[in-house]
Amino acid sequence: MKIIPPKISPKLMNKDFSTIFHEEDPILEMCQISGDEYTDSFLDRPRFYNTEFDHCHFTNSDFSQIEMVDVRFKNCDLANVDMTKAAIHRTEFINCKLLGTAFPEATIKNVSFKDSLLNLASLGDAKIENVQFVHCLLENADFYHCKFKGVSFDQCELNEATFHQTSLKGVDLSTSKFETLSISIEEVKGCQVSTYQALQFSSLLGLIIKE
């Protein structure tokens, strides 16, 4: 699986996030936003293009139907942000807090989540293609009725995550950890797991193993 990284210009203009509130259309492009804090904000279908965010805080904000292309978030707090029906392409989240962040019905393609907190994140009914989760906390994350294609979980914490009505065929969970998952036998067909995880799945599915 090859993930296309963000195509971000090496020459970005420094801007304050507040400029987006003064635009006729809420668009940020070709810019760098550093250290800004705008919590509990509302933006009507915002669009971020070719932009980098560093040490920004947007907790409890409503960014529903946001469009992001060629964007990088580093050390940002996006906890409880609403990104319902978002379109997120060629984007990176690095060392970010996405606790309880909502991505229902989103389209997420060529996206990397690295060293980030996504406990209680909601991705129900999302289309997720060419996406990697690396060293992420995803406990109690909700992947209900998602469409996965080229999705990887590398050394993640997945305890009590939900995958109901989401096929894990071709997904490699072998380097990740969990005690229990909310999943059925149909969803785990074709999933790649470690020997220990195979025993865990057998227990989750009600099988009794005799030695």
Give each language-model segment a name:
Residues K2-E211:
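Tandem repeat scaffolds
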